[in-house]
């Protein structure tokens, strides 16, 4: 028995010695940190195993709890023992649908703007800005629809230039003079052709506006339409038998203006309706001669540029 005890003590001492040798060896070789790190990793492995087991237990408990709750809900559901139970469920669903329906929000009408006294300048601005309520207020208060500024431009001229047809109609109904001329002797029809509104043009012609009225330059509304390039206005004037060959103060017809300004569509339109191409202006030029003159001028410019470039290239060689 004593021998066995001694053997056990000796064996224990040997184990302790081996452990001491290992630690001292590790310290000597500078690998102590590595050994500790390995120990920690082993410790983490054992710890992670225990954590996994705990997590699995937690999940199983949660699943069990969910299944119990679901079972409870199923038990609490109303059973369809008869038709009355079914009708109750249908009524409940209908109520839910009614709750989901959104009630449309009805906007309250905005309060009408109270308009005070309208002076002359406000009246003119309203004609430009298409403010019907201000126009109506001015006229209702007895304002003169033919009042004009220092350039003799009326509210009708302004409304026509902007194409505010409703304002134009209101002013004419109130007694505005369609043939009233401004300082340059332009009528409402001239101003309409500067603005390009066909609807306003039709309204004025239907109200009896002079289709061949002349301004200070003796230009007709067709002259103005060709110069500004408003094709539909020009087409409607021609369809209403405007004078195709009317001459202005320089003797130019609408065709002369079209050629000079290179209004291709207008030129084609005038030719289609039978314009006279042989009429000469005060300079003695027909529309065709103006085209040739322009072409010759263009040729001279290009020839001059060509000669200049030739000389420059010839000089650069030396």
UniProtKB/Swiss-Prot annotation:
One Gene Ontology term of the molecular function aspect: RNA polymerase II-specific DNA-binding transcription factor binding
SUPFAM superfamilies found in the cross-reference section: Ankyrin repeat
ANK repeats by residue range: 151-180, 184-213, 217-246, 250-279, 283-314
InterPro entries: Ankyrin_rpt (IPR002110), Ankyrin_rpt-contain_sf (IPR036770)
Annotated compartments: Nucleus
Keywords linked to the UniProt accession: ANK repeat, Coiled coil, Nucleus, Repeat
Residue stretches in coiled coil: 37-77
Keyword Nucleotide-binding: no
Role: May act as a nuclear transcription factor that negatively regulates the expression of cardiac genes.
Name of the protein described by the UniProt record: Ankyrin repeat domain-containing protein 1
Species lineage: Eukaryota, Metazoa, Chordata, Craniata, Vertebrata
